């Protein structure tokens, strides 16, 4: 949907903008935005942390719905009629068939944001609660640890 380019160099951000415009020329809905590196980094953390919190919230609602014999899928289908809620990250279990969030980005990014909050004297209560729920209730097996140290590459990706 969007590409965020973080750079202090106008030449570099223009070059990247041109490259991405060539790559995504057939996709009119990809928006390219330029900003500072710190803003771009924070956008990534904010996006992933928000989605991680949303996954934790969905899992909590799922548990409650199950307990009171409500149909979680119907509740979410009807709740999503409110466009402010968005339509992604409501599936319980998730696309990997598991509860909570894993993968290579959500656990890393939510923890980076938690630590950055603390480093700046801010209590990250909501982020900590989502992380604690993920660790203790939804995904205590911590399967994301298996992904540490892996290389990012297109080789052998078939």
What are these regions (language model features)?
Residues 66-158:
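NAD(P)-dependent Rossmann-like dehydrogenase/reductase catalytic/cofactor-binding core
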Residues 1-88, 116-123:
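Internal alpha-helical scaffold of NAD(P)-dependent oxidoreductase catalytic cores
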